UniProtKB/Swiss-Prot annotation:
Organism: Bacillus subtilis (strain 168)
Topology versus the membrane: Multi-pass membrane protein
Protein name: Flagellar biosynthetic protein FliQ
Compartments in which it is found: Cell membrane; Bacterial flagellum basal body
Family: Belongs to the FliQ/MopD/SpaQ family.
Protein's gene: fliQ
Keyword Phosphoprotein assigned: no
Length: 89
């Protein structure tokens, strides 16, 4: 197992992690920004107003993006396990 192979697998793992977490983080960021703008314009300083819409939006995004996320992680895991003999040898 060469160092290039290890770096390649680590690079793929980081890429898959970013691809899976990216949509949920982007939606949470967007909803948080919208709620913050709403709070600033209406001068409402309720703490729960910031968290509940983000939780609901991320939950809905998880339902929407869940199958794609699962297929992405399964294909990476399948590739990882199919090349297991290259790791040990």
């Amino acid at each position: 197992m060469s160092s290039e192979f290890v770096i390649s697998m680590a690079e793929k793992a980081v890429y898959v992690t970013l691809m899976i977490s990216g949509p949920l983080l982007a939606i949470a960021l967007l909803v948080g920004l919208i709620v913050s703008i709403f709070q600033a314009t209406t001068q409402i300083q309720e703490q729960t107003l910031a968290f509940i819409p983000k939780i609901v939006a991320v939950l809905l995004a998880l339902i929407f993006f869940g199958p794609w996320m699962l297929s992405t992680i399964l294909s990476f895991t399948t590739e990882l396990f199919s090349n297991l003999n290259r790791f040990a040898g």
